[in-house]
Amino acid sequence: HYKDYKINIVDTPGHADFGGEVERILKMVNGVLLLVDAAEGPMPQTRFVLQKALELGHKVIVVVNKIDRLDARVEEVMDEVLELLLDLNATDEQFESPTLFCSARQGIASYSPNETGVNLDPLFDTIVNYIPAPEGDPTAPMQMLVSSIDYNDYVGRIGIGRVERGTVRVNQEVAICDYHDPSHSAKGKIVALYEFDGLGKNPIQEAGAGEIVAFSGMADITIGRTICAPEQVEPLPFVKISDPTIEMTFSVNDSPFAGKEGKYVTSRNLRDRLQRELLKDVSLHVTEQGTDAFNVAGRGEMHISILIETMRREGYEFQVSTPRVLTKVIDGKVCEPIERMVADVPEASMGSVIEKMGRRKGDLLSMNPVGSRY
């Protein structure tokens, strides 16, 4: 909350394993903060997410952070940001985006690198004045796209999304539909409604068009479903959740060192934890393999490795197999997943990239110069 405004700030992942998630989150917002380190400059993931934001026509505010670093090179980083916007074919308005200079650790922001800020008011003022308010008729029939899910032991699965139009209320009867599955039709009820306040959630009675809210009461709600007023069922388009591409087997640790590191070592502990993860991660697939082993399929190595590390830190002890690529039989042929990779590199790096992709059975489909890069 800032003055008379409520500002929703949503973070996005940058890794390709979560590419669909980036696009779903960007559809919930009206503008973006392009956060750039004053020493490191724009990173590869910065380019990936910014390109998606520009394609959606979002307004951009450039924020150069960590200006208090000893190795800060603010002027050079600003030039790199402008080159990035130019390379990504930004519109004239996006190219003239306002720029702020911050130190998040000190909680200060200023309009010039030569000024020393006092607080973050310049950043919030720029957001209020430059980013458009969400559009949507609060009197129209309610419509909301579920862009993310969460899970709570007390209320079960929680849907998160932005109200596109109308007003959503507690105890409201709703229809649930799916853009990619016209045959899916169900009814539900909003049992509880929450607004986001900082990192927490506060219960509310109703929310209007443009609000980002969380709701509970529908056990099988998932990403991509549209919640509508029953009198006007109209699904919203969304980016489909990617199918799993690799699989690993999680099993009980039966090595000579079993039971020495973790607190939770039995197959029942492992099963319960994986079932809990399925409630909040819709792109994970788990199948039982005998009594002590589980096949866990995900979107990529990073996706599964994050789960493994999280469970290890929680005190679970288990062993994992090497990753296996998942294949599909399409029209009688066995097909393996492929990744369409777009590398944006300086001319000097082209040879190294082509060589490394060749080792992974990569086929070069096209090579186009964009400015001084390929």
Positions of PLM-derived features:
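Switch/connector loops and helix/strand junctions flanking conserved nucleotide-binding motifs
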Residues: 17, 43-44, 69-75, 107-112, ...
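P-loop NTPase nucleotide-binding/switch module
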Residues: 1-24, 86-90, 95, 102-107, ...
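Accessory interaction regions appended to the cores of large information-processing enzymes
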Residues: 96-98, 125-129, 159-374
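Canonical P-loop GTPase G-domain recognition
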Residues: 59, 68-132
